[in-house]
Amino acid sequence: MLNSFKLSLQYILPKLWLTRLAGWGASKRAGWLTKLVIDLFVKYYKVDMTEAQKPDTASYRTFNDFFVRPLRDDVRPLNTDPNILVMPADGVISQLGRIEEDKILQAKGHNYSLEALLAGNYLMADKFRNGTFVTTYLSPRDYHRVHMPCNGILREMIYVPGDLFSVNHLTAQNVPNLFARNERVICLFDTEFGPMAQILVGATIVGSIETVWAGTITPPREGIIKRWTWPEGEHEGSVALLKGQEMGRFKLGSTVINLFAPGKVNLIASLASLSVTKIGQPLATSTETFVAPEVEPAPLPAEEIKAEHDASPLVDNKKDDT
């Protein structure tokens, strides 16, 4: 009964206006009130401020400044093995595995369309059919900048307008094609592991999605698909990003989906749904290495895993925040 009510709210509530209101409030300088809100947020979600470059909450002028806070250089060591792709975001893995032709796993027993996720771009979808995907959810407590899993040359970016459903266990189980319906920014890269897509998905109260090469992509929300292209690596105007380099950020929210071409990478065997992710840790290995490296993500303290799961609405019977 309660879940039915919560699900009904996803369709009834004015999600766009709530998102605009959240974005407006998060960008305002409110002095002591801003600090109070940040302090309450840190306490409620158990945010580890010792990792931040500026651990004092009084140093943030707005909530957005706090939300996209940079981390100290030493807290996310980068695995530099050239055969290894690394995790692009702090968070929890929602789902991962093989793309079955056009089907990507959204939740147990529920799939969505690869081509729909890519805004009907069948040529791009053809690059990833029967490939590999990883969906990472960033909870409110997480660092909200997104980094590169490997070196890449940006070739295409597509902004896709859409709904702003919350991303949580309930919606993943009950909203068909959730990630293919929500607002998103699709980034296509050429890499040494073949084509790779890194998709930043919005949700309720995700105030904005930004990239390092183009700044704020949304808002404004104009309701039309926008597409940009870039030349190959050696040409003037090309955009090259290094493994571990920041490529984008969320101001509130949400989800990152990675797509890899078939036969190019093997996901780290120990990773599964609800695995906790940390930027720079091993995500996958190349299939073309002569000797497969024996790598596993660094073990995390039990209290860190518990705090991440407590903050993640992907975990059933937990909070259903965005």
From Swiss-Prot:
Q: What class of enzyme is it?
A: lyase
Predominant subcellular localization, coarse grouping? membrane
State the pathway, as annotated in the record.
Phospholipid metabolism; phosphatidylethanolamine biosynthesis; phosphatidylethanolamine from CDP-diacylglycerol: step 2/2
> Which cofactors does this protein require?
pyruvate
- Quote the subcellular location field of this record: Cell membrane
Keywords, A to Z?
Cell membrane, Decarboxylase, Lipid biosynthesis, Lipid metabolism, Lyase, Membrane, Phospholipid biosynthesis, Phospholipid metabolism, Pyruvate, Zymogen
Q: How is it modified after translation?
A: Is synthesized initially as an inactive proenzyme. Formation of the active enzyme involves a self-maturation process in which the active site pyruvoyl group is generated from an internal serine residue via an autocatalytic post-translational modification. Two non-identical subunits are generated from the proenzyme in this reaction, and the pyruvate is formed at the N-terminus of the alpha chain, which is derived from the carboxyl end of the proenzyme.
State the free-text cofactor note: Binds 1 pyruvoyl group covalently per subunit.
**What are the protein's GO molecular function terms?**
phosphatidylserine decarboxylase activity
- Active-site residue numbers: 90, 147, 254
Its function? Catalyzes the formation of phosphatidylethanolamine (PtdEtn) from phosphatidylserine (PtdSer).
UniProt protein name: Phosphatidylserine decarboxylase proenzyme
Supply the gene name.
psd
